[in-house]
């Protein structure tokens, strides 16, 4: 059955914009039913057949040559590398902000998106809540993004609680990686930026294990990925954090990276979203890396700002690409007085982590 143009659009929780989708319909192996969310509306659940569709007592795999496995993995990965050697958007860092950005961008099937994540497992710190606890707290109205994804939660007056943070992370990853215009390159590190005539034009990449062992090995030159827009979502400061803005400071494109100041949840989440922007031509900064460059407060174990900051970064990237479906998420220039207040506060002698 042919779908109409209206039915092929996905509604976004970010400013209510509607973006085209390239998803296709498949026949499910389970029956979807409506299940009440605790304190809220329905969520999607599945009731599978009680028995698997094969005989477990005499199960046998189809035969395969080992070389076929090698060829399939290699051919597909090399094809992805060739395809994304010159891409529309490169997202550096696959934490909650980077994944939310990629999800929002992926709704436009004409936009090619590459996500580069140095860890084997994407998701950043969004597999757990605070202090290695399971639950994820999301302040309203960011819960609308959870509704869009179909992630269930318990409701309170001003916030919602997802019973395990991994529910959000696994859901957003499975949704966006199923789309044909997105590729995740995990276990790959970004070592540098491509800069031409004052504009960021891509990233310099290497295998993460190679990048971590430059001091023990001889010359191991990197590779490159050109991009029309780079989104840096490298998180807070640390051994592998805030690398995008640190590199901008190293090469003189920004003057300072003062670091985030002490925790203030109510101020921090609003500021993270508000200050998400294109900091230099060709490079948008999102998530906790924003606090590092602006000296905004530490956010702590709440996650709504990561989601909405990522969505905002996506629409800024769409605007930079000239896409008509972009929501204008630009912000006024930060007042010098406000920026000075952040910077002074962030220079206190304190050791902070996310």
Swiss-Prot record:
Entry keyword annotation includes Plastid: yes
Region (Disordered): 17-49
Enzyme Commission number, as recorded: 2.4.2.60
Location of the transit peptide in the chain: 1-44
Residues binding substrate: 97, 117-118, 125, 190, 221, 236, 288, 298-300
GO CC terms of this entry: chloroplast stroma; cytosol
Self-association state and partner proteins as the record states: Homooctamer.
Protein name: Thiamine thiazole synthase 2, chloroplastic
Lineage: Eukaryota, Viridiplantae, Streptophyta, Embryophyta, Tracheophyta
């Amino acid at each position: 059955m042919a779908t109409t143009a209206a039915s092929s659009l996905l509604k976004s929780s970010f400013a209510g914009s509607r973006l085209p989708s390239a998803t296709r319909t498949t026949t499910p192996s389970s029956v979807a039913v409506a299940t009440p969310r605790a304190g809220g509306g329905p969520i999607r659940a599945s009731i599978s057949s009680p028995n698997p569709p094969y005989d477990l007592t005499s199960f046998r795999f189809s035969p395969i040559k080992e070389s076929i496995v090698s060829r399939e993995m290699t051919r597909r990965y090399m094809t992805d590398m060739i395809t994304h050697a010159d891409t529309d958007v490169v997202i550096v860092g696959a934490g909650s902000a980077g994944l939310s950005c990629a999800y929002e961008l992926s709704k436009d099937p004409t936009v090619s998106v590459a996500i580069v994540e140095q860890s084997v497992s994407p998701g950043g710190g969004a597999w757990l809540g605070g202090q290695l606890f399971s639950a994820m707290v999301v302040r309203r109205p960011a819960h609308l993004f959870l509704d869009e994804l179909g992630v269930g939660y318990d409701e309170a007056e001003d916030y919602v609680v997802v019973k395990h943070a991994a529910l959000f992370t696994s859901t957003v990853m499975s949704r966006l990686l199923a789309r044909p215009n997105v590729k995740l390159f995990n276990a790959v590190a970004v070592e540098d930026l491509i800069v031409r005539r004052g504009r960021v034009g891509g990233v310099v990449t290497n295998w993460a294990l190679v990048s971590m062992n430059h001091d023990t090995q001889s010359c191991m030159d990197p590779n490159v990925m050109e991009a029309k827009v780079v989104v840096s979502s490298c998180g807070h400061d640390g051994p592998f954090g805030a690398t995008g803005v640190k590199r901008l400071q190293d090469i003189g494109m920004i003057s300072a990276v003062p670091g985030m100041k002490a925790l203030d949840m109510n101020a921090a989440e609003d500021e993270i979203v508000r200050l998400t922007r294109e900091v230099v031509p060709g490079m948008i900064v999102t998530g906790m890396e924003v606090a590092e460059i602006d000296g905004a407060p530490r956010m702590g174990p709440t996650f709504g700002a990561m989601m909405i900051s990522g969505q905002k970064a996506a629409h800024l990237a769409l605007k930079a690409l000239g896409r008509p479906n972009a929501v204008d998420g630009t912000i006024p220039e930060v007042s010098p007085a406000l920026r000075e207040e952040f910077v002074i506060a962030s220079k206190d002698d304190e050791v902070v982590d996310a």
